């Protein structure tokens, strides 16, 4: 295996390249652009980023034998700490209890102020995605094998319950008022969940449009609009009425979307794509949408995080170093 280093990107609206990157919003006349890139280094795979806008911290979980949870100052992209032996795909923080969680197995719960591990929490399945729901201060652990969702009390660090969503859970969003929506990657629909009672109340089916392999999901909670991203047979976003599941329209995206976000400050749905692009979709009204910009980032930069304080978007990817001369092929 070739060694690689991670990087973060920043831009007038985006983050980019073999490091962590960040992008920043610009007026309509000026497109989004990459503002900054920062070399991260280190070993291990990577998946999701988590931005704690209030505490000004960016969390980057790393997997593999040398995996750890690396923490950065979100304004400078300088490292501020790490939690060793936390080999995870995703992380989330409850700003009220200052408890953080990462999708290790068992789940690791840590103090977001001190970065000290508080406890581990046994769960079933194969943890992957993660979401914090401020409605009732719970953390949702998502996976592609049953149980598809495990819900944890963020204050106590105890399992509240598990939920069979009917398919592999890719990304979840909350309206903050008692509803959670989950894009199911293998059955072509969106599960609607009562967050208080942990019951599935509806499935919004998009299979009639021929879409498969669901990935990212974003929500305009004010206007009740869902943005559900699909990779097959073509890369598109299906824009759905969150109240009844009716499809409003569809738009093209870049190839290989993973995580997405909706920025209510700019009324844009933003997706990071494995082919090295970031797509910005403008919501002109609850029934009118358009692809505003496709920004070139770097191959592999398929996940993102939004800094809601600055409207910066951060993404990351890996640069592969040349293999040593004596390396086995």
Where are these regions (language model features)?
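Predominantly soluble domains enriched in secretory-pathway, periplasmic, or organellar proteins
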Residues: 11-329
């Amino acid at each position: 295996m070739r060694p690689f280093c991670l990087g973060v990107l920043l831009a007038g609206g985006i983050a980019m390249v073999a490091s962590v990157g960040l992008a920043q919003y610009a007026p309509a006349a000026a497109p989004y652009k990459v503002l900054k890139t920062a070399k991260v280094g280190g070993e291990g795979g990577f998946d999701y980023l988590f931005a704690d806008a209030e505490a000004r911290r960016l969390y980057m979980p790393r997997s593999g034998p040398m995996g750890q949870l690396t923490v950065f100052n979100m304004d400078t992209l300088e490292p501020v700490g790490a939690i060793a032996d936390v080999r995870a795909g995703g992380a989330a923080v409850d700003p009220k209890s200052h408890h953080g969680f990462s999708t290790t197995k068992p789940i690791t719960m840590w103090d977001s102020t001190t970065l000290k591990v508080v406890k581990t929490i046994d769960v079933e399945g194969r943890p992957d995605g993660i979401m914090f729901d401020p409605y009732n201060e719970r953390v949702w652990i998502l996976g592609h094998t049953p149980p598809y969702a495990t819900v944890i009390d963020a204050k106590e660090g105890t399992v509240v319950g598990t939920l069979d969503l009917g398919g592999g859970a890719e990304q979840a969003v909350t309206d903050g008022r008692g509803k959670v929506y989950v894009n199911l990657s293998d059955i072509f629909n969106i599960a609607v969940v009562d967050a208080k009672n942990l019951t599935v109340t509806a499935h919004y089916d998009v299979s009639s449009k021929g879409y498969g392999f669901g990935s990212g999901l974003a929500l305009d909670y004010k206007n009740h609009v869902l943005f559900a991203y699909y990779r097959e047979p073509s890369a598109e976003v299906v824009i759905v009425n969150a109240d009844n599941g009716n499809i409003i329209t569809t738009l093209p995206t870049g190839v290989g979307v993973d995580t997405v976000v909706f920025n209510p400050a700019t009324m844009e749905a933003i997706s990071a794509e494995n082919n090295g692009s970031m797509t910005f979709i403008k919501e002109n009204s609850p029934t009118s949408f358009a692809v505003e910009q496709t920004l070139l980032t770097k191959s592999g930069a398929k996940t993102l995080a939004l800094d809601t304080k600055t409207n910066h978007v951060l993404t990351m990817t890996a640069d592969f170093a040349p293999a040593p001369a004596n390396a086995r092929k």
